[in-house]
């Protein structure tokens, strides 16, 4: 049976909140899935001494200041993050802010380089 996606969305649009809740529960039961948001596992607290010796593998890219060429910095932020124009502008206007979080060192260094080339002041943390 072919079911048109647009017809399905129209049917969903006409449902009440209670009906949508029942639909979610039925889908969970039918397919054995959960609609709960996936959470990242918490880090274990047992290896404190070993963790201090290991090299840091995840970095945050922090935009410190937009500089004089704000438009170029906004474009660079959009390329790096995939944010929309308004969101990227808000991020740049609210500096200092994290542009990217928990990324590999090479990716973080490339992101900082791109921001600096656009005229911003950025750093790794």
UniProtKB/Swiss-Prot annotation:
Gene Ontology BP, a term: translation
Pfam families: Ribosomal_L12, Ribosomal_L12_N
A GO cellular component entry from the record: cytosolic large ribosomal subunit
SUPFAM superfamilies, per database record: ClpS-like, Ribosomal protein L7/12, oligomerisation (N-terminal) domain
Quaternary structure and partners: Homodimer. Part of the ribosomal stalk of the 50S ribosomal subunit. Forms a multimeric L10(L12)X complex, where L10 forms an elongated spine to which 2 to 4 L12 dimers bind in a sequential fashion. Binds GTP-bound translation factors.
NCBIfam families attached to this UniProt entry: L12
Family: Belongs to the bacterial ribosomal protein bL12 family.
Protein purpose: Forms part of the ribosomal stalk which helps the ribosome interact with GTP-bound translation factors. Is thus essential for accurate translation.
Protein name: Large ribosomal subunit protein bL12
Species in which this protein is naturally found: Methylibium petroleiphilum (strain ATCC BAA-1232 / LMG 22953 / PM1)
Lineage: Bacteria, Pseudomonadati, Pseudomonadota, Betaproteobacteria, Burkholderiales
Gene name in the database record: rplL
């Amino acid at each position: 049976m072919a079911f048109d996606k647009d017809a399905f969305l129209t049917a969903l649009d006409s449902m009440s909140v209670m009906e949508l809740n029942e639909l979610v529960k039925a889908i969970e039961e039918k397919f054995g899935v959960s609609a709960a948001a996936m959470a990242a596992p918490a880090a274990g607290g047992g290896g404190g001494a070993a963790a201090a010796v290991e090299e840091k593998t995840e970095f945050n890219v922090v935009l410190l200041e937009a500089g004089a060429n704000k438009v170029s910095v906004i474009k660079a932020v959009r390329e790096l993050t995939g944010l929309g124009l308004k969101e990227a502008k808000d991020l740049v206007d609210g500096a200092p802010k994290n542009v990217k979080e928990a990324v590999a060192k090479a990716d973080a260094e490339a992101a900082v380089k791109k921001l600096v080339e656009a005229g911003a002041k950025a750093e790794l943390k």
